Amino acid sequence: MYVKITDAEARMVDDDGPMSDTDLSTTTDGAARGGLRPATIERIENGLVVVLAVAGTLTIEPGLWWFPLAVFLAFDLSMVGYLRSPAAGAATYNAVHTYVWPLVLAVAGLVAGTGAPTLSRWLTLVSLAWAFHVGLDRALGYGLKLADAFTHTHLGWIGKDAGTNPR
């Protein structure tokens, strides 16, 4: 049997039973204890990915500093799934907005190595540009999409729905 509880009720109960108003040490958001919320930590981490992707690009090919910016919107072509439905759009968007594929390209670049230096360099540059895109999206709060709405992400609601729960 399942019991539906409100968000407020969920925040007031932990494994040891009901919390008092002054017992904030067991909350999961960290903010009550003076810490950072998990979404904030994730945004900071993704900002670091952006910095590392730029540094990697500058290290590999300083003259192509503009490359991550030039291909930035190409990764957003994955939103084409939204023409079908929010669920299809979330699936195609999330399939592209993950660190898995940039990692696969980076490994392919390493494997190509000295046997094909031009291929290796371009695979690595594309992987860095892809990681730059994903990292910047998440650092700005554009997380992985949930199937119910484009504006509903794993980091919360975005756009006109930010700070609300429209459903």
Q: Could you describe each region identified by the protein language model?
A:
Residues Y2-R167:
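N-terminal membrane-targeting hydrophobic helices
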